[in-house]
Amino acid sequence: MTPRSWLFVPGASRRMMDKATTSGADALILDLEDAVAPDAKAEARRTVAAFLDTGPAIPCFVRVNGLGTGLTEADVGAVRGRVAGFVLPKCEGPRDLDRLSAWSGNAPVLAIATETVRGVRALFAEDWSHPCLL
């Protein structure tokens, strides 16, 4: 089944993740980026990993921190192999997808927004086809 409804859930709140599984959404996006305070990123990673260890019955994607933060690889490493895929914020082109794919073992990537001017320009200047894009 292709998910039609996606629910963003703060990665720092186990209670909200547990509740989200009964929301009726087709998939969850566990957010480690904007929904988590900078000083809570490491703890949120552990919280998301522990939630995924319970084997939720709903597909879960993880929105990692952007490549420019220096946090992306640790985000991916904490949940690799236990998610339906990843959401990469501020993606600016296929090279960014290549980096995420290398860390994730070619897990699917959900591309839902282009958030930077460079990314928008790249949409028109580059071929964005990538084997990991959903």
Regions found by a protein language model. Give the residues of each.
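Conserved alpha/beta-domain cores
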Residues: 2-134
